[in-house]
Amino acid sequence: MVLDHGAVVAGGWGVPVPWSGDADDLPSGYDDALVRAVQAREAGIPATTLSFMAVAVGSAHDKRGLATVVLQGLTRRAHEAGLVHVIAPLRPTWKHRYPMVPMDEYAAWVRPDGLSIDPWIRTHQRMGARVLGPAP
């Protein structure tokens, strides 16, 4: 959560899930991550990974880098809690502009600097993330 004079301007959340670190073992998306988190908790299976679920920034505070601040805070807290990995089943911001392009192709498009054409993927890449694959 990011505060500005006592008002919440940005925040986010994630769920702890067990994950082997193998791309083939990734949750298939938001719903699967949440189901895995609940099932693992109920079965006493320890989590190894934080799956980001959402980040929100108030529209009056957009374009100030607050999403990155929230993601960094969640990542820090995940590591402090002993989680080894952080994953983000994200929805690329500009994918709707290219409805006929398969997600895996879209996610591979890069600018001359080597970063994704998509601003939300780029935000994660600047934090050290890499695209592991599209959700089914």
Regions found by a protein language model. Give the residues of each.
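Conserved acyl-donor/pantetheine-binding loop and adjacent beta-alpha core of acyl/acetyltransferases
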Residues: G12-A54, P92-I117, A135-P136
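Residue-level detector of anion-binding/catalytic polar loops
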Residues: V84-H85, R130
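Short alpha-helix
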Residues: D118-R126
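Conserved acetyl-CoA-binding loop-helix of GNAT-fold acetyltransferases
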Residues: K63-E80, V86-A88
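Conserved beta-hairpin
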Residues: M1-G12, P27-S28, R126
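Active-site acidic-Proline motif in GNAT/NAT acetyltransferases
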Residues: V57-A60
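Conserved acetyl-CoA-binding loop of GNAT-fold acetyltransferases
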Residues: Q125-P134
